[in-house]
């Protein structure tokens, strides 16, 4: 079918298309479908799409996906979305992403997310991010995450956070970190903490600081 022919199909006709036939549809044909048509597909139909077909969808089409459709995406299909497509997801769609889908995203995908999208992430999904993903967080993104979200970050990955991002973490979030998370920080990260962040440390957190890390604190912040 040509793009013009595909665009002329009704929603009922599109829903009747067999999965094997939808998988054979040209990317140009998919890109001309109305957003209502996209949201009318079953998760089974969408599951037949290949990575090139997913990437051919416009940002408006991606944003039209229902939360059930988003949650039903295969992990490889979610990972195939472009950074522009991911950045177009609504906060409701972000919440609908499964932990497995989050784990399949790469650092460029994470770096493309807006602060409202990051704030919508479930804590279990933050825990699914690896060290490379966390290293991609900007200072603006780091500042947007809540104390509960930061507490969910795996200790093994915590040391990957850039010094710029760490310096932007809220004082409430710093005070809520576990001693194990803080123990993963390197001397350069300790040295990047602001005076306000250091003052927010609890007595238990301070007691857990190693002498090496104490030595990394600059005189104007210790």
Regions found by a protein language model. Name each.
Residues 1-222:
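General marker for long, soluble alpha-helical cores
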